[in-house]
Amino acid sequence: MSASRLERRIREAQAAGRPALIPFLTAGFPTPERFWDELEALDAAGADIIEVGVPFSDPVADGPVVAAASQRALESGVTLRWIMDGLAARKARLRAGLVLMGYLNPFMQYGFERFVTDAADAGVAGCIIPDLPLDEDADLRALLAARGMDLIALVGPNTGEGRMREYAAVASGYVYVVSVMGTTGVRDGLPVEVADTLARARQCFSIPVALGFGISRPAQLEGLSHPPDAVIFGSALLRHLDAGGDAASFMKAWAER
């Protein structure tokens, strides 16, 4: 099977001797208007892939920063339809691979078949749906694959080898390795078990391995003898934007590491 768009983005970064950079930005944050400016700024500043968060009223896996951003976006009227329309209008000038990350309910309300059609038309390359179990994702995975899109798998410290191999049998794009159990959020360091989780993921998956949850600065990766193929950062970026910073300056610190 040939590499997907998302896998190719990460492999291109590896060929350049660096991990791929994957910022996460909640759709409609800090404001609906500024969101699109910051999305394009991330793209221009060198993001290889951008995860666009779909706001939801009950974000059980999100820490306070992402949850607050989601609530603000909902109060501003942001919907999955709004996201689709905005991405479609900009797809010709966005270089980064686009991933929609959100909880199952908004996608179900939209309708899987209509969602996949509209996502493909908007230039989306993949989806992450944390609360869609592997045992129930076959229909959506097939619909996405038929349009050249990936359904990204998430694994963590408590994912056993058997379960990892089940994910690996159907996974495409990249595998999202959660650094720590619990919710998203900025942390000072990485748990000691991260190296083991990354090593187990590398043994099971042939696609690139991306590390997320609690990643805020390049220095956190220095203690890893085998760093991930891609790095995902969200809460630190959202906090930076909320404090008046801009996406380009945040990306610069990562691009120059």
Swiss-Prot record:
It catalyses: (1S,2R)-1-C-(indol-3-yl)glycerol 3-phosphate + L-serine = D-glyceraldehyde 3-phosphate + L-tryptophan + H2O. One of its GO terms (molecular function) is tryptophan synthase activity. The active site is at E51 (proton acceptor), D62 (proton acceptor). GO terms for cellular component: cytosol. Keywords: Amino-acid biosynthesis, Aromatic amino acid biosynthesis, Lyase, Tryptophan biosynthesis. The alpha subunit is responsible for the aldol cleavage of indoleglycerol phosphate to indole and glyceraldehyde 3-phosphate. This is Tryptophan synthase alpha chain.
